[in-house]
Design a protein with these regions (language model features):
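Single conserved hydrophobic/aromatic residue that forms the stacking wall/gate
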Residues: 1-14
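Conserved pre-ATP/AMP-binding loop-to-beta segment of ANL
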Residues: 110-112, 235-241, 246, 252-287, ...
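AMP-binding/adenylate-forming catalytic core of the ANL superfamily
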Residues: 181-207, 221, 371, 378, ...
Length: 682
């Protein structure tokens, strides 16, 4: 977690005053409510109740908004308590058709569908729905010409370039199952995912821009293919997108195809008919981050995912026809799938896609994009917010952000100070904030504010979305112990009772892992792996992953709370807390913190003050035994702290930090730096 030193001292005092009470409620303006899709909590509760008690009627009504080649015979069939779920049984549709053709049929052919901003400022492209359909069909026909067919699994190892959503939609159009692998992953991580899904075809690029540097993506793709071959999987075809001009990469003649040349062939038609997909046909496989363990391939299917992403986008972002939507996620993660590509396009929206990082060439790149494209809805991660908080406020003030009407947060709980900074400096205290909680397994948002219906509490994910019934359960200590719901404000394990259309159907090729990982910890419930509590207003507060709980002398403590306390000190920019073995307590707390560059106090004085803050805010039991000052955290290329590495350092298991852990880091050298300065045992 991070905090800012960039805001004025006056604003810092305001933040602390405003966040002393965790139940502060911030309501949307009357003007916002009057134009919102859902305008009261009572209306929300009526809709939510119907979605739980009568899901067939609720979701069946929404599904009528789509084009179906054949109508469904049953809305839902299954046993949610064991993860056996089918939606829109017997129906046939195509998500690409509904993203593009159906929008054109509704009169949106000349509306801008995709605004692409490359890292070079001049590299800006606008695609209407007509344009996008033409590009998608040509890509689809090129893939079909080269042997890609319905049911084939195809890996997309592409960065944030406009061809990525085009190829995704092309796969969906012809029934191929796409597996997007984050462009920042190493060859080893890419090969792991290719082997896991058995993909024999890949789309990659010759290179891309990252912070002013040309990155050779093809080299990683070639190495991954070699690793797959060594493991017994031969990659038959690699299709190469020429992103970089005058950037030569080697081609393997028997395997590689330059898509740019294929697309110029006369035989590649501008139209490709959409495959009639069964509602439960696979759409994509999305692998979880490689930061921990072997990758898990969540399998999402066609119709349920389509209906759910459409609905969450419409209501959570209160989408209107003239909105410009900017989600800063990478499409290599589920947020980019659902809220850069599928959710916006299914609603006929204009979606913004940016190639690179928020701080290049200057720390105002996001604010510049918002100003340039007149963005109305901005959706980003707390990690990004906290990083930009640490920049001078002038980078925001030089841009016009007045078109913004709604802000969103995704990826992790947002600490209250970051929430207030985001609201004040980006939203000018007039934009509601939707703090969304969900997972790769979910397909779309599960808990969030509905911005016109009820207010936000800084740090709380708020209330469940339609079709989602969360409960907080006490931990079970034995296999035959029944599930017990936690009391109000009592921390426990966040589980889900019901099924919703977007839920993954299984882990690809690993049905037992699917069952054991999600349905055995609390039998009869979907186990999210997150801790939470529910307050007296029904709002849910996410306390972090269950494995981020440390047991000190029999007391279970969530590290997120301790990080929040450390961040309340004005000299701390970022904090990460992990457990390490202690011969008396069982475990103790090890805090890694980054100092504000403008801090004048000595490290020893700050260390004492930090312990005092934690003692005051949480209690003596939560005071970290060790506090180490670091220059940078070990983060993967999506900006998330890899806590597994910090645990190894804290536990003095440095020799167990494998190359596969280090390969996913944006700055691998930081590991040695932190390890060399590890605080030893006295």
């Amino acid at each position: 977690l991070m905090r800012s030193s960039a805001a004025s001292d006056v604003y810092k005092r305001q933040v602390f005053t405003m966040t002393e009470k965790r139940d502060d409620l911030y309501l949307p303006s009357r003007e916002f409510v009057e134009q919102a899709h859902i305008q009261s909590r009572a209306e929300y509760e009526r809709m939510w109740k119907q979605s739980i008690e009568d899901p067939d009627t609720f979701w069946g009504y929404i599904a009528k908004d789509f084009h179906w080649f054949k109508p469904w015979t049953q809305v839902y069939r299954g046993e949610p308590e064991i993860g056996d779920n089918e939606w829109f049984v017997g129906g046939k549709t195509n998500i690409c058709y509904n993203c593009l053709d159906a929008q054109i049929e509704k009169g949106r052919g000349d509306k801008v569908a995709l605004l692409f901003q490359g890292e070079p400022e001049a590299d800006c492209k606008r695609f209407t729905y007509n344009d996008l359909l033409k590009h998608v069909c040509r890509f689809a026909n090129a893939l079909k010409k080269n042997g890609v067919k319905k049911g084939d699994r195809i890996v997309l190892y592409l960065p944030m370039i406009w061809q990525l959503p085009v190829v995704m939609l092309a796969c969906a159009r012809i029934g191929a199952v796409h597996t997007v692998v984050f462009g920042g992953f190493s060859a080893e991580a890419l090969a792991d995912r290719m082997l896991a899904c058995g993909a024999k075809k890949m789309v990659t690029t010759n290179g891309y821009w990252r912070s002013g540097q040309k990155i050779n993506a093809k080299a990683n793709a070639d190495k991954a293919c070699m690793l797959c071959a060594n493991a017994g999987l031969t990659i038959d075809d690699v299709f190469v997108v020429d992103r970089m001009v005058d950037f030569e990469v080697p081609y393997i003649t028997y395997r590689d195809t330059a898509l740019s040349k294929e697309l110029m062939l006369d035989e590649i038609s501008d139209y490709c008919p959409a495959e009639k997909m069964d509602a439960e046909d696979p759409l994509f496989i999305m692998y979880t981050s490689g930061s921990t363990g072997s990758p898990k391939g969540t399998l999402h299917t066609t119709a349920g995912y389509m209906v759910y992403t459409y609905t969450t986008f419409k209501y959570i972002f209160d989408y209107k026809e003239d909105d410009i939507f900017f989600c800063t996620a990478d499409i290599g993660w589920i947020t980019g799938h659902s809220y850069i590509v599928y959710g916006p396009l299914l609603n006929g929206a204009t979606t913004v896609m940016y190639e690179s990082v928020p701080t290049y060439p200057e720390p105002d790149r996001f604010w510049h994009i918002i100003d340039k494209f007149k963005v109305t809805i901005f959706y980003t991660a707390p990690t990004v917010i906290r990083a930009l908080m640490n920049q001078d406020i002038q980078w925001i003030e030089k841009h016009d952000l007045s078109t913004l009407r709604l802000l969103g947060s995704v990826g992790e709980p947002i600490n209250p100070e970051a929430w207030h900074w985001y609201s004040h400096y980006v939203g000018h205290d007039r934009c509601p904030i939707v703090d969304t909680w969900w997972q790769t397994e979910a397909g779309g948002v599960l808990i969030s504010t509905i911005p016109g219906a009820f207010g936000s509490k800084p740090g709380s994910a708020a209330l469940p979305f339609f079709g989602v019934k969360p409960v907080v359960l006490r931990s079970r200590t034995s296999g035959d112990e029944p599930a017990v719901e936690a009391d109000v404000n009592e921390k426990g394990e966040l589980c889900l009772v019901s099924a919703w259309p977007g839920i993954m159907r299984t882990l690809y090729g690993e049905p037992e892992r699917h069952q054991n990982g999600y349905y055995t910890q609390q039998p009869g419930y979907f186990f999210t792996g997150d801790g939470a509590y529910k307050d007296e207003d029904g709002y849910f507060w996410i306390t972090g992953r269950i494995d981020d709980v440390v047991n000190i002398s029999g007391h279970r403590l969530g590290t997120v709370e301790i990080e929040d306390a450390l961040l309340s000190h004005p000299a701390i920019v970022e904090a990460a807390v992990v457990g390490y073995p202690h011969k008396v307590k069982g475990e103790d707390l090890y805090a890694f913190v980054i100092l504000d560059k403008n801090s004048k106090e000595s490290e020893e004085d700050i260390r004492k003050e930090l312990k005092a803050v934690v003692r005051s805010d949480i209690g003596p039991i939560a005071v970290p035994g060790k506090i180490q000052f670091v220059r940078e955290m070990p983060k993967n290329r999506s900006g998330k702290v890899v806590r597994r590495i910090l645990r190894k350092i804290a536990s003095n298991e440095i020799d167990e930090i494998s190359d596969s852990m280090i390969n996913i880091l944006a700055e691998p050298g930081v590991v040695d730096e932190i390890a060399q300065n590890r605080i030893g045992d006295k």
